[in-house]
Amino acid sequence: MENPSLISLKKISRCFNTTTDICALDNLSLNIHAGEILGIIGRSGAGKSTLIRCLNGLERIDAGSIFFEGVNVSNLSETEWAPYRQRIGMIFQHFNLLSSQNILNNIALPLKLTGINKKQRHKRALELIELVGLCGKEYCYPAELSGGQKQRVGIARSLAANPKILLSDEATSALDPETTQSILELLADINKRLNLTIVLITHEMEVVRAIAHRVVVLNQGRIVEEGRVKDIFTSPQDDTTIAMLKLVTPQLPEKFAKNLKPRGQEAIIEINIAGEITQQPFLNLLEDEIGLRARILHGGIDTVQGETIGRLFLGLPAQNQEALKKAVQWLTEKGRYCEVLGYV
């Protein structure tokens, strides 16, 4: 059963007046569930940045409604928006730390701005320093920290006021792969420990695959696909999603792709698999049941949300079309997706 919606977007639009109106968000509806990690992905210009600015009230929508914990916040004044904005944490690609302040004071800054006394600020900042793994760095200055450590400070600062939701705007895009992984693991840990809702705005499928529970794909201001991450990875439907997945999933080697024909001696098949079938010798089972021996041309196995998924490219003898048809049907039943790409 899904958790209740923390934020609901109802047919929102945001257009910018130029010589021709450009709608960065176009009649978009979305529910963000309490406690989930939601990945929002799309190419440059898809509307991701505008969406996050609408979520935190920095952009005002032109049409539709935004509900925060059931309250319509779409038309609130800046003063009325303030208490809701305090429930939203933000982390960015650039860390935006105060170079003249030590780590403890950087983290405590949001509390100082809201009038929390020094003793409480100090206590809360120390708790967050421990949470993000920076014990011993309390009195260091930003210039003394690595990029990953600076982002940990940014995360701690975003949590200072105990937000209900954390918005991450390309927060790992400036980091190296190893540091990116450590930051994503930290966010996943914070999500579990605090039951904190996290929205990841990113153009990187690797980020979504690593920790998101659900993914939304944006294109030209509209949601073109959404669902559980493992479902999107194994059975993408929209061309935008398929194109973005090509960057992070195995592809048919060029020596086969450039020689595909309508007919041939060997059928080239793509199959996506998930769950129990990944633990079985299913190609042996295929040979036993259908009588065709498949060869693996390329592929890979990965783990998404604790479930094993895979994408394989197979070659199957095509001389017996009836047997081939049965084999494709058998593979379709066993896998999430199966397609004959052509013949060689």
UniProtKB/Swiss-Prot annotation:
First-tier enzyme category under EC: translocase
Key words of the record: Amino-acid transport, ATP-binding, Cell inner membrane, Cell membrane, Membrane, Nucleotide-binding, Translocase, Transport
Keyword Nucleotide-binding found: yes
InterPro entries attached to this UniProt entry: AAA+_ATPase, ABC_transporter-like_ATP-bd, ABC_transporter-like_CS, ACT-like_dom_sf, MetN_ABC, MetN_ABC_transporter-like, NIL_domain, P-loop_NTPase
A Pfam family it matches: ABC_tran
One Gene Ontology cellular component annotation held by this UniProt entry: plasma membrane
Residue ranges constituting the ABC transporter domain according to the UniProt record: 7-245
SUPFAM superfamilies: ACT-like, P-loop containing nucleoside triphosphate hydrolases
Topology term for the membrane: Peripheral membrane protein
Binding locations of ATP: 42-49
Its EC number(s): 7.4.2.11
GO MF terms held by the record: ABC-type D-methionine transporter activity; ATP binding; ATP hydrolysis activity
Reaction(s) the record says it catalyses: L-methionine(out) + ATP + H2O = L-methionine(in) + ADP + phosphate + H(+); D-methionine(out) + ATP + H2O = D-methionine(in) + ADP + phosphate + H(+)
Similarity-based family: Belongs to the ABC transporter superfamily. Methionine importer (TC 3.A.1.24) family.
Biological role stated in the UniProt entry: Part of the ABC transporter complex MetNIQ involved in methionine import. Responsible for energy coupling to the transport system.
SUBUNIT field: The complex is composed of two ATP-binding proteins (MetN), two transmembrane proteins (MetI) and a solute-binding protein (MetQ).
Name of the protein in its database record: Methionine import ATP-binding protein MetN
Organism (species): Bartonella henselae (strain ATCC 49882 / DSM 28221 / CCUG 30454 / Houston 1) (Rochalimaea henselae)
Top-level taxonomy: Bacteria, Pseudomonadati, Pseudomonadota, Alphaproteobacteria, Hyphomicrobiales
